[in-house]
Amino acid sequence: MTKTPITLQELRQRIYRKAKSESTHRFWGLFTHITKMTTLHEAYQQARKNNGAPGIDGKSFADIELEGVIPFLTGIQEELQAGIYRPQANRKVEIPKANGKMRTLQIPCIRDRVVQGALKLILEAIFEADFCPNSYGFRPKRSPHQALAEVRRSILRRMTIIIDVDLSRYFDTIRHNILLEKIAKRVQDPQVMHLVKQIIKATGKIGIPQGGPFSPLAANIYLNEVDWTFDTIRRKTAEGNYEAVNYHRFADDIVIAVSGHSSKSGWAELALRRLWEQLKPLGVELNLEKTQMVNVLKGESFGFLGFDLRRIPNRNKNGFFVFMIPKKKARTTVKAKIRELIQNAGAKPAQDLI
């Protein structure tokens, strides 16, 4: 009797359940699943959906599809299985940051995006079982809106001292040896570990490039123990249903909310120090010039995920709500794009412009 092969989704669910039920289990035999055509094809589809620019080889999705997706993926599969796969150099692109400085994105070629995506599809199933609920960035079924909603919830539950944390060049400071150790706690497949090492070391001796599919997962793995430390603090400092400290992270954007009650005086400073102590062994530094502590009871605002948040009284003055507005630079950018669209519209019908 022929055994029906399981789908990629079923495989990921099985891996997740195993990881969830056995928190110290180290997985092996994963490389076979990474190199399966179904995994590579799904990784290609995800890369195609994002429709990024070509990498250093100049090859676009249109070029690949003209020559044939299956031959393209077969070539990747054969390189991986033969042990001769080598990532190409990334194409560097600079984009402006909100503060006027430039951020360097490193764009892998599509071939390498597919390999990273296949690796992510399998490893994500393991580490999703380990990740803390207070982490929201680049995770399945999680979004910036959920992170913002939880920050608002913390403020409404009287955690009114806000630590707006800025990490200094987080992705550039991730230490490869520490990241590999963290992954190896769950993975004992030498071929997978070799592939991870190839990907993260392709751009230098320290840091991981922003722009590849694997980087967000690696960044979450790196800070997961910090996330759980603050979840423990949240539980230990809670009094019944009332929490005194809450922590929210989206990639490298962190907010810590602390009770403004007089009995909790000094707790915010202790929370910030604890964060510094947790980050120091990882080589991650706080940007002390930009990390700020604000009191929303005094009408002070703070930024999170492109929004300015402020606590203001409601119309009847018998309560309050958290007001969110896109940051000024974001509003200016959107207005400029709308203006450009209108100016370039010419005599187009309104429905086409919309």
Write out the residue ranges for each language-model feature.
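Non-catalytic, polymerase-adjacent accessory regions of viral genome-replication enzymes
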Residues: M1-I70
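Short, hydrophobic/aliphatic alpha-helical segments
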Residues: T35-Q45, Q198-I206, Q292, P349-L353
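Residues immediately flanking
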Residues: I56, L121, V165-L167, G260, ...
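Conserved polymerase palm-domain catalytic core
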Residues: F72-G75, E79-E94, A98, D130-V296, ...
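Duplex nucleic acid-engaging cores and interfaces of nucleic-acid transaction enzymes
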Residues: I110-A118, G346
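Electropositive, glycine- and tryptophan-enriched low-complexity nucleic-acid-binding patches
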Residues: G117, L121-N134
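A conserved non-catalytic segment of reverse transcriptases
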Residues: K201, L282-L353
